[in-house]
Amino acid sequence: MKRMIVRMTLPLLIVCLAFSSFSASARAASEEKYWDHWIERHAQPLDASNASNKDLRFLKKVLKGKRIVQLGETTHGAGEINATKVRMIKYLHEELGYDVLAFESGFPDTNASYLNMDQLTPKSTMKNSIYAVWHTEDVVELFDYMKEQKEKGDPLILTGFDIQSMKNSFNVAATQWVKAVDPEKAELLSQSENDFSTLVTDSNTFDEFSQKKEKLVKNYQKLIKFTKTHASELKENLPKEPKAYEMFMHSLQLRIDVMETYMLEEMKEKLEEYPENIEDFSFFMRDRMMAEQFQWVADTLYPKKKIIVWGHNYHLRKQNTKMIKDWVQLNGPNMGDYLPERLKKQTYTIGIYAYSGASLDSSDNKTVKPVTSPPPSGSLEALLKAADRPAVFVDFLHTKNKKGTSWMYTPRTALYWGYMEEQMILKEQYDGVIWLEHITPSVIIK
């Protein structure tokens, strides 16, 4: 009897599934003709040659009620992406009152460099604070602007939220501050910073790592105790900036936290000892800790400030675990997943993508990675070509699902670093996107 039922129902099921699939495809095809028309009418042109920035006025309406604006990027190594973001940052600061810029770079490095900005050239501040992939003329212009704004009394404050650091950047600045109070403690700090930077790379066994780590943790605990007991003297010698003492203390504690969690996992993975749960890999742990750092910046360091975030699309998008397919094909949690809902509600997240061109590979800042061109049919990059402009912005957050916008609400391909296919529902990952027709590799300056 069961076999008879199967024989009778299986053909019917196949027909139903086939019809359902055909209907969905037919419906999508019928809606596609409306997509181009909607994009032509509603994609906001961006004109870098417009000195008055009239083309950016739409941001006042789009960002209403949003305390945090996240500016993503499909690749770290493209000049046009950097230039677009720098221009938007200036507008956001001058016209909409965003006064903090948080980079995807080390918290200790960015804050120490900002505190010492008065003593450094814009180029030196840039090199001491953010990763080398952004050491370009476009970004020097941003740091020049930050220095000017600080001198005018309307600062655009630099900070960071990453747990990875650059050797010597925080070390040089912090050692000078401590040396004025206690030269011996300054030497302890300098040596600890040097040992911290090589803790994983110079350890060959887990026991060796553990012994070095325990010694370093004790060193930083001594430095934290010293900082607390000599708070008034240190504050006299720290740069005369609000929160300088809090930044210094947090940087010291962060060193301990990173050693006890992220570096511990890095060492295990170096020895090919892998965790059972995907979120415990150092790759995903970094995003969790970046979310924690950003939360501290937003809630404790600058609780009343409006904040701009500069980072990669991957880290900033809303919820990587809801991706259909991400670039590593694991859909593990990203920084956006880990942020608390109350901060997410205050945030407008912008992804940036490119139609053609090339960018640098950030692994060496030399290798050129071409953008897949033409992009896949039906992809985000391909669809926004219909705007027939060199650069456009499209708002997702305030756009309802209808015939002309269904592409935002249905599975869509977009390219990571311009050449690796990811699949997502755009509305779930971004509040808006910037599309650039062409990008070129960044020129890294020495």
Curated annotation (Swiss-Prot):
The keyword Cell cycle is annotated on this UniProt entry: no
A GO biological process held by the record: response to antibiotic
EC code: 3.-.-.-
Pfam family, one: Erythro_esteras
Keywords, sorted A to Z: Hydrolase, Signal
Gene3D superfamilies listed in its UniProt record: Biosynthetic Protein domain (1.20.1440.30), EreA-like (biosynthetic domain) (3.40.1660.10), EreA-like, domain 2 (3.30.1870.10)
Signal peptide: 1-28
GO terms for MF: hydrolase activity
Top-level EC class as recorded in UniProt: hydrolase
Protein name (Swiss-Prot/TrEMBL): Putative hydrolase YbfO
Organism: Bacillus subtilis (strain 168)
The encoding gene: ybfO
